[in-house]
């Protein structure tokens, strides 16, 4: 009986030890440090000098942009709002009064807006950030009880893709007078990044001493800052008073036809 008691005691301790080690192994979860060293500024200052004001109003529609999945919703909203703000500044700098339309659809113009607007500016496009497949590598953590880090890594270069199209409309008819498109893949923007995520397995004992770094969010913000500046620079070049006044005759004819 005594021997049997010792055996049961040993088996119980072994069971507890096994459960403790098992819990330790399952609980191993390496820490990931996400850097936050880049601010999403989205700044642009009109390059041309302010010209003489005109007694003309331009309707500015909200941008109809779509974004890649790796761009956070708050970044999308700021990009859209800053686009409206900076294009408004560019148009004001060219001597126009700007009426902001809280819609991206020209069909939402009120009759009063159609009547008083000399022109309307609409924007649509896709803002895409993607890893360059030629310069990006992925490394997945292998399962293991001891030396598995429990971290998957993707390291490479983030590049832009997509497009932005700006359309100049006559508000009363809704007809397009002109447009221009920017191919974002042609921009010389390259942001190095390291994206670190937890593996599907928990990692081994060594994972408790591992700290992973993830700067992919900073790379996204840096790329968006540069993309925004490039887009605004092109819009600033195109939406000059000289160019916009060249639509005077066509705009007047279209508005006149609808007013008859």
From Swiss-Prot:
The keyword Iron does not apply. It is found in: Cell outer membrane. One of its GO terms (cellular component) is cell outer membrane. A lipid is attached at residue 28 (N-palmitoyl cysteine). SUPFAM superfamilies: XCC0632-like. Residues 1-27 form the signal peptide. PROSITE patterns: PROKAR_LIPOPROTEIN. It comes from the Bacteria. It is a lipid-anchor. InterPro entries: NeuraminylLac-bd_hemagglutn, NeuraminylLac-bd_hemagglutn_sf. A lipid is attached at residue 28 (S-diacylglycerol cysteine). Gene3D superfamilies: Putative neuraminyllactose-binding hemagglutinin homolog like domain. Keywords: Cell outer membrane, Lipoprotein, Membrane, Palmitate, Signal. Pfam families: NLBH. Residues 134-139 are annotated as: N-acetyl-neuraminyl-alpha(2,3)-lactose binding motif. This is Neuraminyllactose-binding hemagglutinin. It comes from Helicobacter pylori (Campylobacter pylori). The lineage of its organism: Bacteria, Pseudomonadati, Campylobacterota, Epsilonproteobacteria, Campylobacterales. The gene is hpaA.
């Amino acid at each position: 009986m005594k021997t049997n008691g010792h055996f049961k005691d040993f088996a119980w301790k072994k069971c507890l030890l096994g459960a403790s080690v098992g819990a330790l192994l399952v609980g191993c979860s390496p820490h990931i440090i996400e850097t936050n060293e880049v601010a999403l500024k989205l700044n642009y200052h009109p390059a041309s000098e302010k010209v003489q004001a005109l007694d003309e109003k331009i309707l500015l529609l909200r941008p109809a942009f779509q974004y890649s999945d790796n761009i956070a919703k708050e970044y999308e909203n700021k990009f859209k709002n800053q686009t409206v703000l900076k294009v408004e500044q560019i148009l004001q700098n060219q001597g126009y009064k700007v009426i902001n339309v809280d819609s991206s659809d020209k069909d939402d113009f009120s009759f009063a807006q159609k009547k008083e607007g000399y022109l309307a500016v609409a924007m649509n496009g896709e803002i895409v950030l993607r890893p360059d497949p030629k310069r990006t590598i992925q490394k997945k953590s292998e399962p293991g009880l001891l030396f598995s880090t429990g971290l998957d890594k993707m390291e490479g270069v983030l590049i832009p893709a997509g497009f932005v199209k700006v359309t100049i409309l006559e508000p009363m008819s809704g007809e397009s007078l002109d447009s221009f498109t920017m191919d974002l893949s042609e921009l010389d923007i390259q942001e190095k990044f390291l994206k670190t995520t937890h593996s599907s397995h928990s990692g081994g004992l060594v994972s408790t001493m591992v700290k992973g770094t993830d700067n992919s969010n900073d790379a996204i913000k840096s790329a968006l800052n540069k993309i925004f500046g490039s887009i605004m620079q092109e819009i600033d070049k195109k939406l000059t008073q000289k160019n916009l006044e060249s639509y005077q005759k066509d705009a007047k004819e279209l508005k006149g036809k609808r007013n008859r």
